[in-house]
Amino acid sequence: MRSLESFAALLAASSAAAGLSAIATEIGFPPHTVRLDPDLQSTLGLPNAVRSARLASGRGALRAILVECEHDTPLRTVATTIAQHCAAHASQLLWLLIATQYNGCDLTIATWSADRSKPRVVALHVDRTHIVPSDAETLAALAATAAESDILAHSAWLDTLGRDALSRKFYRNLQLVVANLAASATLGTTRATATERSDLALLYISRLLFLSFIQTKGWLDYDRRFLHNTFARCMERGGNYHRRTLLPLFFGTLNTPPRARASAARAFGRIPFLNGGLFARTTLERRYPQLRFPDHTLGAVFGELLSKYRFSPREESANWSEAAIDPEMLGKAFESLMEAKG
């Protein structure tokens, strides 16, 4: 039985046809594949930028298309186009698409249901240079369907690559991380209620999760791992991430126009000014000015949330859904937390 580390390595190594075949084999397809001729490629909607296209036949109606595209080919567009053509010309088959960019970074594993005029694609879309644990968990869940019948396997693919399974896992982890962060808070000589501690923990986590979306666009000093790198550097220098990094980042940088920033704030690099109120001190924070969260529980926020899941600013649409945390899913998770608190 493979470990999550080996599933992660499999995703990272899938830069060419052999790597795609290895993934398909893990999911239950035989290793033998056949090359798709140009006419069939056209029928299935494969773009001209395809370097290699092969077909694997699984149990019953299961089929996998393994596509190696040029390095700059947008795989989301490839997936939706192929899904539409397969639904139009071969709707009796149950499809899985595994596509990669030759010498590029993107990898997509997608499936769809053909029971509608325009199929809805559900997908795992990853950056092979930065595989996160939830990516490996998704591939492991797909591999667990290898012994299922064709209809049950396809149904499991739809569930695994859809948002619901990921949303449930994320919500459970979010609940646990908020509770642990709240319990670890120190407030000097002032005592806070359990509700206040929870509200403060939720506030800090909401800020960090918001920044996780911002950094995926490279808006935090052009560094898509800005938060993780600042945490690592702070630990190397003795720790105290809350006081030495989060406080000046939140209250001297993100909530301050660039021209008004002090030298310590400018040291973070090119950071946008966010004037929406999220990075303004709340009444509760002013009530507890000595609030501190220790490094070990902030580290757990990274380990159980920020580093574990893939964050995507792209929200789900009627015809596309990714196995990633998007703003809509995050909003629903916070709503559920607030309802649970009563």
Annotated model-derived regions:
Residues 2-15, 26, 39-43, 49-53, ...:
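Preference for the N-terminal adenyl/adenosyl cofactor-binding alpha/beta module
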Residues 53-81:
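Active-site ExK catalytic segment of metal-dependent nucleases
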Residues 90-94:
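Short glycine-/polar-rich loops that comprise or flank the Walker A/P-loop
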Residues 85-89:
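Short, charge-rich binding segments
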